[in-house]
């Protein structure tokens, strides 16, 4: 009889600073589920990792006098970094993914190219109020006294070229799935 499979993942954490208790809580909860499923006889794939791209990392790296890659390497692999913490906590993940890994970059580029060629992704411009520490765009109505509703810091007007997913292409299928 073939084993049933079970896939579980934490969010891929954003390593702009040392982890906090929320990261540990989420990872321990995910680990507990993975271990339980293994005890039930499932073939489990437990993934965790880091999303190592973004303005906040670039800014923090510059402040630390490092390149972005050096900065995230220190957070992930350095003494008392993420990998040390997960080892100390005996986390049973099967895979630790880093979005800067060559294989990950190649896979994402292939997926992106395919979706772009099919018209699922298109380039456009996004405008809004931007909070750099939170890496979030906000509308005017979402702001609290003109500041970021999450952290209370000042926001700035920002406009950037971005890629968008053409959700409208799948509207009928999504509607059908929601109704059934």
Predicted regions and their residues:
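N-terminal, positively charged nucleic-acid-binding surface of large information/translation enzymes
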Residues: 1-180
């Amino acid at each position: 009889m073939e084993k049933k499979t079970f896939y579980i993942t934490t969010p891929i954490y954003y390593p702009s600073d040392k982890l906090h208790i929320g990261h540990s809580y989420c990872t321990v909860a995910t680990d507990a589920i993975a271990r339980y499923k293994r005890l039930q006889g499932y073939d489990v794939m437990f993934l965790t990792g880091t999303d190592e791209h973004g303005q906040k990392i670039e800014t923090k790296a510059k402040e630390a006098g490092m390149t972005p890659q050096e900065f995230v390497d220190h957070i992930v692999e350095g003494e008392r970094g993420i990998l040390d913490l997960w080892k100390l906590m005996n986390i049973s993940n099967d895979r630790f993914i880093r979005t800067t890994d060559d294989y990950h970059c190649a896979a994402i580029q292939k997926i992106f190219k395919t979706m772009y060629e099919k018209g699922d992704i298109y380039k456009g411009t996004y405008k809004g109020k931007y909070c750099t520490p939170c890496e979030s765009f906000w509308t005017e109505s979402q702001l609290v006294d003109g500041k970021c509703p999450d952290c209370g810091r000042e926001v700035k007007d920002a406009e950037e070229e971005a890629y968008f997913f053409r959700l409208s292409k799948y509207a009928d299928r999504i509607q059908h799935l929601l109704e059934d």
